């Protein structure tokens, strides 16, 4: 997921800066907002959505356990949370599966506030948007809201190699192999860890699904990546844990949704729906149904 990877790396850089510590918007420069764009292009009001009986969610394609299609049927954590939102608003949830762009800015521009130059569709809501105050003030065209979970980095491992009292930590990967998603934050972290001492043992895969498949097949000793993806790919021969990760600026982040800035009433309604589902346990049950740990968001 190029957009999420690039965005999380950027957030790590922001978090390490002095401007962020004092004022996340200290170096903020005003951005252009959409001009002369029709209502059917930039989004829709609440009453229009309820009259038409459905709303459109942008979700990332081929991204288990969060959003994918199985025999043409949408599945995943983000799909089920989107359905909760739509149900609370009294409409049907429809989905636009999108590929990740170069960064989160591009994804928000193409899917929420402007539209792609060719064949783009504007969604009412975009799921799985990393929430950060420094990034939030840099994208005026979008309302960041509806924080519904946290994600964090973990390490999955072969239980035949590592015993319960000797689970792997990054220092082990000076000698042991570890699988990561190529160009992910885990890849960048391990490549620079201890002055690059573990970089030679890092095995890179196109995505975490393939990385976990390699671990389960005994082709690598461990895998490092987002906890949810690791848990979803576990087998009877593998397990996962979360050791302290020294120097990892963004080992945990909050996930929410994005709505076009022109439709704040919709953003409020979406946030309310998510808040209710957090309070009554429905979102936690969604994670449980996919065999995942639920990490409550900071709201």
For the regions a protein language model found, what residue spans apply to each?
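Ligand-binding cleft/hinge of the Venus flytrap
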Residues: 83, 87-97, 172, 183-205, ...
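Acidic, polar ligand-binding/catalytic clefts
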Residues: 95-170
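A ligand-binding cleft/hinge motif common to bilobed small-molecule-binding domains
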Residues: 127-138, 191-192, 216-251
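Extended ligand-binding regions for polar small-molecule ligands
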Residues: 22-40, 82-88, 159-163, 175-177, ...
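Short loop->beta-strand "edge-of-pocket" segments that line small-molecule binding or catalytic clefts
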Residues: 55-59, 168-186
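Extracytoplasmic small-molecule ligand-binding "clamshell" domains
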Residues: 23-25, 31-124
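Periplasmic-binding protein-like
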Residues: 149-156, 227, 231-274, 293-299
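Hydrophobic residues within well-ordered alpha-helices
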Residues: 85, 112, 214-216, 270
